[in-house]
Amino acid sequence: MKKIMISVAPVAATDILINPRAIARDVYECYKNGASMVHLHCRDLNGNLTPDLSLLEETVAYIREMCDIVVEISTGGVSNLTIEERVQPCYPSWVEANSLNV
């Protein structure tokens, strides 16, 4: 049998309102249906990319309360952030995987 990993990206680049609990619920539904990894970007409440990890950490905490999906944080996306700001999600212990676009 071929092994596969299903990764979900529950927040679109066009999403303008970020709700950590709603994202976690969506991730949980995906997990129940076979997803094993979630791809998240670090965004503020208005959907803009940000180096502030507080909402992302809150979102991951809610996800962890519901399921044991692998959390992969992206440093990518088109933004005005510096490379130093973009790599901030690589450091927290609650992040299991990263994608890094340089």
Regions found by a protein language model. Give the residues of each.
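Hydrophobic faces of well-ordered beta-strands that scaffold small-molecule active sites
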Residues: 4-10, 38-40, 69-75, 96-100
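Alpha-helical scaffolding segments of alpha/beta enzyme cores, especially the outer helices
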Residues: 25, 29, 54-62, 85-89
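Extended substrate/RNA-proximal surfaces in nucleic-acid metabolism proteins
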Residues: 80-102
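Active-site neighborhood of glycoside hydrolase catalytic domains
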Residues: 61-71
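Glycine-rich, proline-tolerant flexible connector loops at the mouths of alpha/beta enzymes
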Residues: 34-59
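Conserved, mostly hydrophobic/aromatic
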Residues: 23, 30, 41, 98
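Active-site mouth loops of central-metabolism enzymes
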Residues: 7-25, 74-83
